[in-house]
């Protein structure tokens, strides 16, 4: 049975009266006090206890009301009403401190809930946009496949063009699936073991798949080492993905026949390596340069059939960089080009 504060006080006062009366009765039986004195002491005890109860009630009633209000407040919060409640309790001290602690907890939980809702909304929009992006290449693949199957496309140059489109759309689908996979695994806390990296060999493995595309688009790609860089420890898998995404971005947003430069430099004082990928593309206006790594920004502004993909490459690259002891910075001029620089911190591997 759970008793209220008022009930507990009343029980305490009544118990005090009964205990005092019992002691006085025993004292009377033992003839420590005469009858008149015992009666006087008993009445005095009862009157004093009643006055004490009255005074306690005067002070305790406001406290009880505050506790009831605080209880209502906590129930509303427990039921999902996270609206701000500015009601404060200035006294007594314990109630004030309890209210302050609750308000702090409520504020933190509200922020977390809002963040969760925002992230959930972003994920929903992201999935919807990716689903929309998947429809376009699939529709194109189905259309050209049916045309080839049914004999609608018969001329040699049309057949070759159709195969080129099918390959292009299949590659686009592959990129979309890669982006979806990386988005799913970004926040899973997956870790990668540090590996000894020889940078020239790493770049060869990254650039090799682009060889045919660079030749086909009549581009020039140059890799420049400012100095000889010794092997160092870093997270190879995320680094490969970061550089691949930045290179993809440079190729997407620059014209056929343009130049791509990769410049590598080392800062031995800070124990860092800079890998700068520069293009001669359309550039990025200054007010958008800080937003290009946002997930929603890229989804909203890069979804088009010309560039392909989901527009999430820079977001994925930046997230991987932050998670793996690296940083990406951007420098760009409109109609001149963009330079994306990855700054790697060499890992200190102690045995």
Swiss-Prot record:
Its EC number is 2.7.13.3. CDD domains: HATPase (cd00075), HisKA (cd00082). SUPFAM superfamilies: ATPase domain of HSP90 chaperone/DNA topoisomerase II/histidine kinase, Homodimeric domain of signal transducing histidine kinase. It is found in: Cell membrane. It catalyses: ATP + protein L-histidine = ADP + protein N-phospho-L-histidine. It is an enzyme of class 2 (transferase). GO terms for biological process: cellular response to phosphate starvation. Residues 129-348 form the Histidine kinase domain. GO terms for cellular component: plasma membrane. Residues 61-114 form the HAMP domain. The keyword Phosphoprotein applies. The keyword Cytoplasm does not apply. It holds the Pfam family HAMP. The chain crosses the membrane at residues 9-29, 40-60. It is a multi-pass membrane protein. Autophosphorylated. GO terms for molecular function: ATP binding; phosphoprotein phosphatase activity; phosphorelay sensor kinase activity. Member of the two-component regulatory system SaeR/SaeS involved in the regulation of staphylococcal virulence factors in a strain-dependent fashion. Probably functions as a membrane-associated protein kinase that upon sensing the appropriate signal, autophosphorylates and in turn activates the cytosolic response regulator SaeR. This is Histidine protein kinase SaeS.
